[in-house]
Design a protein with these regions (language model features):
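Domain-level marker for long, solvent-exposed, non-transmembrane regions
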Residues: 1-134
């Protein structure tokens, strides 16, 4: 798909606070989806015997640790839907759905995983680049 979608709901005393929190949670949702997709790529590469179990464990560990970094690196998202309602206690409940370009998402994840592996001094990032076509 060209875009991946993330959504989240949040409740706050005022609309702006609830919306900001919902947007951050939606970005976390996107980051989780990206993380899952990259992990699946790595597992598929292991299944095809192109990476050893130890190498895959190292990459997967980097991917799991990078969810917050992926979320932070997500650039401008496209708001697809935003609805709110006032609850009985006067708090605002906001639901947002956002879209993000799939290619940009994958690039962000690749960059973060590559940097993490380089920091560890792991030469695996070069093998991974070749195997996954990064």
């Amino acid at each position: 798909p060209k875009y991946i979608m993330g959504e989240a709901m949040s409740i706050g005393e005022n609309y702006d606070a609830a919306k900001m929190q919902a947007l951050e949670l939606a970005k976390q949702n996107l980051a989780g989806q990206i993380q899952t997709e990259v992990t699946a790529l790595v597992e598929n590469t292991v299944a095809n015997k192109q990476l050893s179990q130890e190498q895959a464990a190292s990459v997967t560990q980097s991917i799991m640790a990078s969810k917050n970094l992926i979320s932070q690196s997500i650039g401008r998202t496209i708001p697809v839907m935003e609805v709110y309602r006032t609850l009985f206690n006067k708090n605002k409940e906001v639901l947002v759905r956002i879209a993000y370009n799939s290619n940009m998402a994958k690039e962000a994840a690749k960059k973060i995983v590559r940097e993490d592996l380089e920091k560890k001094g792991d030469k695996l990032h070069k093998d991974l680049d070749k195997l996954l076509g990064w």
